């Protein structure tokens, strides 16, 4: 028997980058988790739109529905250290703050306790979809996937790969072990029951600095062999990181686009975090390869060494997919609302720096990036991101008032 839910009231969602639709008295029909009816006025609803005795939710004053937020870049093991190390250069921040925290996830009991709180916190913030970096520990990564699955959060979960240029206590023993554990995590995630496909694996090289040639090549082979497998990494995050990458890979002359492409890691399912310092050539390559960008404005303006404002307007002008990321850890907030605010502030700064060429983001555009734009980056735009009929009902029910306030 079909399960039917009806929502009546205020609905807000993006139709495209520039169009944010506010509907005062919408009717949404959800059948077995999918949107099967959407009308903008009560008068438009057919008499036979839903079966009798359907469960109807009439939204009260101060309540509305929005699509669930999509977090395109999130370090789950860094959730306990949000806000620490602000102002440090990126490689110093990793060594002094991040690696010691992530090393604790070698303990599965600790990992389970932290990840339960982490996932619950992001769900409480309305983040119904997240692309998670795990730690380098396979067991902890499986635990994270299990928790996302149990809590009903749509997630991409990846075991972080790092077999060099990290302290011994966190560095993986070899590329072979890293690759084998990654394959085992992929099998585990794809075998979660019941099979609702909410949780998916993602190949996760930390960045080229921490990966040997053998490891990058092996991960690229996985991505090339499976056209459903997503890849995420950091890309042109900060000048210190770019300089270190160029020193390790001099043959690519500073182009991370050429570097990652040479290993088979760039395609339409690639999620590239940050992208703050970009040449026109690299923008052209990402556009041609249809990669997605995870814009992390909070982290980019507080960690890494410098005032790093990604050229989001130029990305959008070129048709490059862009979503927002909390970058939990580097980003001090779990809230996508905070990320939206910071994205708008950063874009205002970018407009000044570009002498008006790169116009600041509007509220409509920032909201799009946090929902439908993020869905595009994760190649989920046909499933979630707005309330189009046929999509899955992935939403946040927002209440802005209390009983006291309504009296």
PLM segments and residue spans:
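Active-site gating loops and adjacent loop-to-helix segments of metal-dependent hydrolytic enzymes
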Residues: 80-113, 164-175, 238-269, 292, ...
């Amino acid at each position: 028997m079909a399960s039917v839910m009806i929502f009546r009231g205020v609905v807000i969602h993006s139709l495209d980058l520039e169009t944010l639709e506010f509907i005062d008295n919408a009717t949404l029909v959800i059948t077995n988790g999918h949107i099967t009816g959407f009308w903008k006025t009560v008068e438009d609803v057919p008499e036979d739109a839903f079966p009798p005795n359907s469960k109807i939710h009439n939204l009260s004053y101060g309540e509305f529905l929005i699509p669930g937020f999509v977090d395109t870049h999130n370090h789950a093991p860094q959730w306990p250290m949000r806000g620490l190390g602000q102002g440090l250069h990126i490689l110093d921040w990793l060594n002094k703050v991040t690696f010691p925290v992530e090393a604790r996830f070698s303990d599965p009991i600790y990992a389970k306790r932290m990840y339960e709180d982490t996932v619950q916190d992001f769900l409480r913030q309305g983040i119904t979809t997240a692309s998670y970096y795990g730690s380098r520990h396979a067991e902890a990564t499986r635990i994270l996937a299990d928790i996302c699955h149990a809590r009903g959060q749509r997630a991409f979960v990846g075991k972080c790969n790092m077999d060099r240029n990290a302290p011994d206590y966190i560095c993986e023993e070899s590329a072979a072990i890293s690759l084998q554990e990654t394959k085992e995590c992929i099998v585990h995630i794809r075998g979660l029951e019941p099979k609702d496909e909410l949780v998916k694996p993602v190949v996760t090289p930390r960045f080229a600095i921490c990966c040997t040639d053998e490891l990058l090549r092996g991960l690229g082979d996985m991505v090339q062999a499976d056209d459903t497998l997503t890849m995420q990494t950091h890309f042109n995050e900060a000048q210190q990181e770019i300089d270190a990458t160029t020193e390790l890979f001099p043959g690519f002359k500073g182009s991370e686009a050429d570097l990652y492409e040479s290993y088979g890691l760039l395609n339409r399912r690639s999620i590239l975090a940050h992208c703050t310092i970009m040449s026109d050539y690299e923008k052209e390559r990402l556009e041609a390869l249809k990669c997605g960008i995870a814009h992390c404005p909070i982290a980019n303006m507080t960690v890494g060494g410098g005032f790093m404002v990604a050229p989001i307007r130029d990305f959008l002008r070129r048709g490059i997919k862009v979503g927002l990321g909390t970058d939990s850890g580097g980003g001090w907030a779990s809230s996508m609302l905070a990320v939206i605010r910071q994205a708008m502030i950063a874009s205002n700064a970018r407009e000044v720096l570009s002498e008006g060429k790169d116009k600041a983001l509007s509220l409509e555009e920032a909201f799009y990036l946090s929902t439908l734009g993020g869905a595009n980056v994760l190649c989920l735009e046909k499933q979630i991101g707005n309330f189009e009929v046929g999509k899955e009902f992935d939403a946040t029910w927002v209440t802005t008032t209390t009983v006291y306030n309504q009296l």
